[in-house]
A protein has these predicted regions:
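C-terminal accessory regions
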Residues: 124-240
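Conserved helicase motor core of P-loop NTPases
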Residues: 1-148
Length: 240
């Protein structure tokens, strides 16, 4: 009986039906739905309210991610050149030794939260590593479950324009040098994230973009499948 119930729920779920449709290699244009869980639109149908409706926006490319993040921040009235209280951000790397206030989480790649405090940006020169100044800011980040990461030292350039101030080699040198503080953490705005960052996570309401991108047919299918299955309740999908 339990298995029958699971099968019945799966058969009734438009999200599951769409994921199976995609796995079979069928185009989005041929998927039929009543709009209860899944709605599929074209680019010309996009309205601003879709961006604020979604718990998470997912796309394929960094160019699209940056475009959406800039647009959402503009609509929120946030200045483009500086972070704001309430900005949604995502960790780009694992920092297993950085533990949340309650001790429940480590700061991992893909961790998403909201800025609750940030300091004015400061500049320092790790002269043993690089002659170039590095802009940093101290930030507190609140997670969805209200746990917090406090006093995070963020790479300001990485967050605001998407370019890390240090190379991977320089970060390694800083983190392993007794002469320097640890390298600042790399974060990005997270109103939109790429599908690869979204893997393993799930949100109630997802806005997804199919996009045109230079991947083969099989990769495109895997992308759409992963995107679709990130939504647990409702999915709005924008066809390319």
């Amino acid at each position: 009986i339990f298995l029958d119930e699971i099968m019945r729920q799966a058969a009734e779920s438009e999200i599951i039906q769409l994921s199976l449709h995609i796995r079979e290699g069928k185009p989005l244009s041929t998927f039929k739905c009543n709009g209860k869980e899944v709605q599929i639109f074209t680019q010309k149908d996009i309205v601003d309210g879709m961006y604020s409706w979604a718990d998470q926006i997912i796309c394929a490319t960094n160019n699209k991610r940056n475009e959406i993040n800039n647009f959402v921040r503009y609509k929120k009235g946030f200045a483009p050149e500086t972070p704001s209280i309430g900005d949604k951000i995502i960790s780009l790397k694992n920092h297993w030794d950085c533990i949340s206030s309650r001790g429940d989480w480590a700061l991992t790649n893909g961790a998403i939260g909201e800025i609750t405090y940030f300091s004015n940006r400061n500049v320092f020169v790790p002269f043993y590593i690089s002659e170039n100044p590095i802009e940093v800011m101290t930030t507190n980040m609140k997670l969805e479950d209200n746990d917090n990461f406090n006093q995070l030292l963020l790479d300001y350039k990485c967050l605001t324009i998407g370019v890390p101030a240090l190379s991977s080699k320089q970060q390694y040198q800083m983190n392993n040098s007794k002469m320097c503080p640890d390298a600042p953490y790399e974060f990005a705005y997270a109103y939109a994230i790429t599908c690869w960052k979204a893997q393993g996570s799930e949100w109630n309401k997802v806005l997804g973009f199919e996009e045109n991108f230079p991947f083969d047919k099989e990769t495109h299918k895997k992308y759409l499948y992963t995107l679709t299955t990130r939504a647990s309740e409702k999915l709005v999908l924008i066809r390319k």
